Curated annotation (Swiss-Prot):
Probable transcription factor. Plays minor but redundant roles with MADS6 in floral development. It comes from Oryza sativa subsp. japonica. Residues 228-249 are annotated as: Disordered. One of its GO terms (biological process) is regulation of transcription by RNA polymerase II. Residues 88-178 form the K-box domain. The lineage of its organism: Eukaryota, Viridiplantae, Streptophyta, Embryophyta, Tracheophyta. Residues 1-61 form the MADS-box domain. Disruption phenotype: No visible phenotype, probably due to redundancy with MADS6. This is MADS-box transcription factor 17. It comes from the Eukaryota. Keywords: DNA-binding, Nucleus, Transcription, Transcription regulation. The gene is MADS17. One of its GO terms (molecular function) is RNA polymerase II cis-regulatory region sequence-specific DNA binding.
Length: 249
């Protein structure tokens, strides 16, 4: 039956701790020796006990291995330092270049503003004059372009307002005509006139006409007896028509 898994924590019992240290130390030294022999590796092992006692193993000697270790660490630190120094040098050169460019731009700006012109030669002043003329020309062109765009915008708004004003005017005229027509119709009903096609017609009923209605049946005409009286026509009425009391003979 195998042993259970050992819990990795400090052994509280002093005797057991000392026994375990001795066993594990001897095993570790044995493994270091086997590794150096089997793999032809340079192995160095240094152990200090809890009481400060030194135990060591070196396949090629502890001092030689330590010197080799220190040499490797120093070279690594030197290479890192060289890389850091080169990076710092690169940043310093970039900073110097940007600083020089900034000073040049500031000096050019002062010249554009008419400052510090004393040290400039005639050729430099002529070049500065050309630059100022070019800048002035560009500024004027840009100003003219902006003004033309604003004028076009104002004209477009003016056309829109004109169309809107025309629509409102037509709408008001149509509403006024409709209102006048309704008023005229109302007045016509009050005063007995009717407006038709722009003409005023009299809507009052015509006066009574003294006439007698007639009734025609077929091809015969009925006449009231008073109208058929021959005396009203000066006599001789019976001899001139074929009607007697409205009926044919």
């Amino acid at each position: 039956m195998g042993r259970g898994r050992v819990e990795l924590k400090r052994i509280e019992n002093k005797i057991n701790r000392q026994v375990t240290f001795s066993k594990r130390r001897n095993g570790l030294l044995k493994k270091a020796y086997e590794l150096s022999v089997l793999c032809d590796a340079e192995v160095a092992l240094i152990i200090f006990s809890s009481r400060g006692k030194l135990y060591e193993f070196g396949s090629a000697g502890i001092n030689k291995t330590l010197e080799k270790y220190n040499s490797c660490c120093y070279n690594a630190q030197g290479s890192n330092s060289a890389l850091a120094g080169g990076e710092h040098q690169s940043w310093y050169q970039e900073m110097s270049r940007l600083k020089t460019k900034l000073e040049c731009l500031q000096r050019s700006q002062r010249h554009m503003l008419g400052e510090d012109l004393g040290p400039l030669s005639i050729k430099e002043l002529q070049q500065l004059e050309k630059q100022l003329e070019y800048s002035l020309s560009q500024a004027r062109q840009r100003k003219t372009q902006i003004m033309m765009e604003q004028v076009d915008d104002l004209r477009r708004k003016e056309r829109q307002l004109g169309e809107l004003n025309k629509q409102l005017k037509n709408k008001l005229e149509a509403e006024a005509d409709s209102s006048n027509c309704r008023s005229a119709i109302q007045d016509s009903w009050v005063h007995g006139t009717v407006v038709s096609g722009g003409r005023v017609l009299n809507a009052q009923p015509p006066p009574d006409i003294d006439c007698e209605p007639t009734l025609q049946i077929g091809y015969y005409q009925f006449v009231r007896p008073e109208a058929a009286n021959p005396r009203s026509n000066g006599g001789g009425g019976d001899q001139n028509n074929n009607f007697v009391m409205g009926w044919p003979l």
